[in-house]
Each structure stands twice: as C-alpha cells, then as structure tokens.
C-alpha cells in the first residue's frame, strides 16, 4: 500500500478512537494541518473520552520528549521519502504501553509489518528475525551509540502478553 494510504488509515483510526495516539498523533498543529490537507480529510471532532485519552497520552509523552525526538530522527533516516510524517507518528506511539501494532490501532502484527514494509523497507530487511518492533528500534539505536551499552527498551518481562511472544 502506498505510504499516503497508510497515513490515511492511521488518520481514520485516530479519529475512530483506536490505538494509543497522543493528541494530533503527536504532530505540531502546523504539521497536523499539513497532513490533513495532504490527505484531503476534514477535521472531525473527537468524542469526549477519546479526547481525554489523547490529551493524557500527549502529557505522558511530553515527559519523554528527548527520547521521542531521537527515535523520530532515527526513524526518519530510514523512512521512504513520501511517507512523512510517519516517522514522527511511529516515534510518538512507540512511547505507549502495548505492542506497536496495538498502539497504532492496527488489526494485527502482520498489518504492522506491511506498514513497515511500505514505509520503512530497509528496517524490515534489518529485522530479519522478526523481533518486536519497539524492541528492535531501541536495540538498533543502542548498537549505534558509543560508550554506555545500557539501552532503554520496552520490558518484555513485565508485559502481560509475554507468553504469546516467547512460548
């Protein structure tokens, strides 16, 4: 699927209250409006509960701004040119608490792999062992760092779905 179609899919999931997106998918007001125009979409108001959840995620993500910026910049280096602002969106949602496909509101991990194949094809090739995407992102970033080798990455040991991944 072309990256623009993936952006539209995420736009629709965001407005349907799916996933763990922050407000405006973490984009600045200017970038949000640019995405809306690019997609040809009309801004539809979020229901009260969804708006509250989106605001809460934005507040939580704000406490990890430096991490989000670093992850977004790293992802942007691997992103297809016509996929912007997908790197920012993925970086924002990567700070949420579930598997990335769930936090994006996608139907399955397989659907996330399709998104990644279309928007970040080189990362899919690099992830030859099909590691969970959040863990893969942080592991790759850690390998590029010099000095301290301690990496902040999602903790599989604390995940309630651990048995589904490691049986």
Swiss-Prot record:
Pfam families associated with the record: NifQ
Family annotation (InterPro entries): NifQ
Gene Ontology molecular function terms on file: molybdenum ion binding
Keywords: Molybdenum, Nitrogen fixation
Gene Ontology process terms (BP): nitrogen fixation
UniProt entry tagged with the keyword Thylakoid: no
Family recorded in the similarity comment: Belongs to the NifQ family.
Function per UniProt: Probably involved in molybdenum processing.
Protein name: Protein NifQ
Species: Klebsiella pneumoniae
Lineage: Bacteria, Pseudomonadati, Pseudomonadota, Gammaproteobacteria, Enterobacterales
Gene that this sequence comes from: nifQ
């Amino acid at each position: 699927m072309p990256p623009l179609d993936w952006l539209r899919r995420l736009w629709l999931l965001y407005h349907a209250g799916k996933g763990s997106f922050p407000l405006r998918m973490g984009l600045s007001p200017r970038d949000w409006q640019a995405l809306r125009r690019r997609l040809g979409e009309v801004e539809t108001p979020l229901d009260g509960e969804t708006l509250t959840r989106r605001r809460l995620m934005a507040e939580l993500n704000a406490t990890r701004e430096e991490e989000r910026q670093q992850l977004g910049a790293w992802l942007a280096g691997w992103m297809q040119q016509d996929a912007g602002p997908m790197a920012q969106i993925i970086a924002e949602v990567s700070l949420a608490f579930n598997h990335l496909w769930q936090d994006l509101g996608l139907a399955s991990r397989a659907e996330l792999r399709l998104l990644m194949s279309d928007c970040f094809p080189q990362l899919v090739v690099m992830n030859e062992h099909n590691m969970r995407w959040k863990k893969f992102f942080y592991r790759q970033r850690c390998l590029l760092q010099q000095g301290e080798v301690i990496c902040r990455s999602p903790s599989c040991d604390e995940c309630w779905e651990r048995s589904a991944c490691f049986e």
